[in-house]
Amino acid sequence: MDRARGSAFLLGVLLAGSLFAFSVAKEETKKLGTVIGIDLGTTYSCVGVYKNGHVEIIANDQGNRITPSWVAFTDSERLIGEAAKNQAAVNPERTIFDVKRLIGRKFADKEVQRDMKLVPYKIINKDGKPYIQVKIKDGENKVFSPEEISAMILGKMKDTAEAYLGKKINDAVVTVPAYFNDAQRQATKDAGVIAGLNVARIINEPTAAAIAYGLDKKGGEKNILVFDLGGGTFDVSILTIDNGVFEVLATNGDTHLGGEDFDQRIMEYFIKLIKKKYSKDISKDNRALGKLRREAERAKRALSNQHQVRVEIESLFDGTDFSEPLTRARFEELNNDLFRKTMGPVKKAMEDAGLEKSQIHEIVLVGGSTRIPKVQQLLRDYFDGKEPNKGVNPDEAVAFGAAVQGSILSGEGGDETKDILLLDVAPLTLGIETVGGVMTKLIPRNTVIPTKKSQVFTTYQDQQTTVSIQVFEGERSMTKDCRLLGKFDLNGIAPAPRGTPQIEVTFEVDANGILNVKAEDKGTGKSEKITITNEKGRLSQEEIDRMVREAEEFAEEDKKVKERIDARNQLETYVYNMKNTVGDKDKLADKLEAEEKEKVEEALKEALEWLDDNQSAEKEDYEEKLKEVEAVCNPIVSAVYQRSGGAPGGDADGGVDDDHDEL
């Protein structure tokens, strides 16, 4: 919903989840009925269906087109949607929300540990996974997996669609953040099964939104950036749309950033205020927090349209009524770092897509949090004043796209959708190890799949008859810092001097994201191959994040080293140039008074000694030292020039007339 790659999950888990949707539609048509599209959101969910040549977003039994992703248990029943959310303040420990932040994660994940402290319901560790413990009727304690709670929400969406269509629904396209990893996707599919749904396809939220935007767009190629900031997750995807072909160029995001985090900041602000003003700590009072959470969300929404809102809560604690103003400026200040955090993935996706800002034709806003004026302003500023496109409904676009995808799979979309094709990308660079442990890249990250790349290698020892092919993925230059996917040997190479044999290595990623690697000795025609599949145990989101983060950290370290060397060179250059200037008769030697000369020479001598003693000082130290020396020398040089009628400070930099890097 890290930059280094198109998407955040494992190579080949299809980013759009729908590559070759069109080409496989025919074979799936037989077994699929009407396929609905479900946007299973962190805070709200939405369902749509393609009917009579267009998408219908279906209203629930309360008449609302979006349904809160909330589940609650009372002494007598289970509540889902509005009914659950509306009673949360009086039943906090038994009301479950934000379960999408738990699905497919491990209990030990730092995000889970953080969220545990913020929700009123109980999260426990079961087999290393977070489960929810809740009292159901008759005081019985029951433990639910995140998949089960998600299934309840999916079931509600299924019921909503069935009531509207008047028939049973078995199949659905369900969306996930582009940045969801394999475990999170698989868990979402499992939730579908528990809900009695065949999840015909998992597709990415920004890609689904791109379909909603681009379905009726004809005429010429367009680059669009989908900025999807929802209740709990954030995605950026850059796509090229050309008459029904949706090609993902790059994707990036954060699976733990969204409107819930903004609400939390408002809550923390008021908790502190209440403590200060009333000497009352409500941070452990679940009822008070439930009321405050509801009002924080309401205030946040209101501030998208007005500059000030009053947060009023009857009997918040000890019978005390609470009433405080919240301005838009304060809200923006409370969330400033989080809003700015959204720009990182935008920049990285742009770099990965290889596009200039001017080459983005449209910025499509998706997710309720994109209504926040500050978020829109940051995007506008980044894109040099370009206005985001507000043509799609940010709450409904994802379900809309999922419904279109459903119609392609079922064949019910007819001529209107038959030409739609989604093209996916390989999220991480793929390559092999060559001499010295070097990662030689064959398929760079964000390459559209399916793809095939070949490269010729040779032996590095005389009479070598076997080569070992080791396949890696990752962004680092050495294989020790990348992830080994598999290895195999090519035997029976004809003995020859090193560098003579020609061994062609071919990487092929098919539409399912399965990597085939083949090595062939061009001399003998002998070949070996290995198939690498996308197994569940492969890279987690955290590991991919770590690889890219490390690559970025190393790039940052390299930059710091260069800056330090530049600062040292600058100081040395100044000192030696100044030394020449004051010692050269044609320059200043004869124009300086004895006292001035002594002062300058002493400063230069001291600086050179300092340089000898501080070979590995920090950039700031070198800069500080340069300022010190300049403070002594420059005024004296300026004074000499003024006395001799030259331009004041004419060569006060000690005659530095170039800034070429020294060899």
From Swiss-Prot:
One of its GO terms (biological process) is ERAD pathway. Glycans are attached at N614. Residues 641-663 are annotated as: Disordered. Residues 654-663 have a biased composition (Acidic residues). GO terms for molecular function: ATP binding; ATP hydrolysis activity; ATP-dependent protein folding chaperone; heat shock protein binding; protein folding chaperone. Keywords: ATP-binding, Endoplasmic reticulum, Glycoprotein, Nucleotide-binding, Signal. A motif (Prevents secretion from ER) lies at residues 660-663. It is found in: Endoplasmic reticulum lumen. Induction: By treatment with tunicamycin. Overproduced in fl2, defective endosperm-b30, and mucronate mutants. PANTHER family: HEAT SHOCK PROTEIN 70KDA. Probably plays a role in facilitating the assembly of multimeric protein complexes inside the ER. This is Luminal-binding protein 2. The lineage of its organism: Eukaryota, Viridiplantae, Streptophyta, Embryophyta, Tracheophyta.
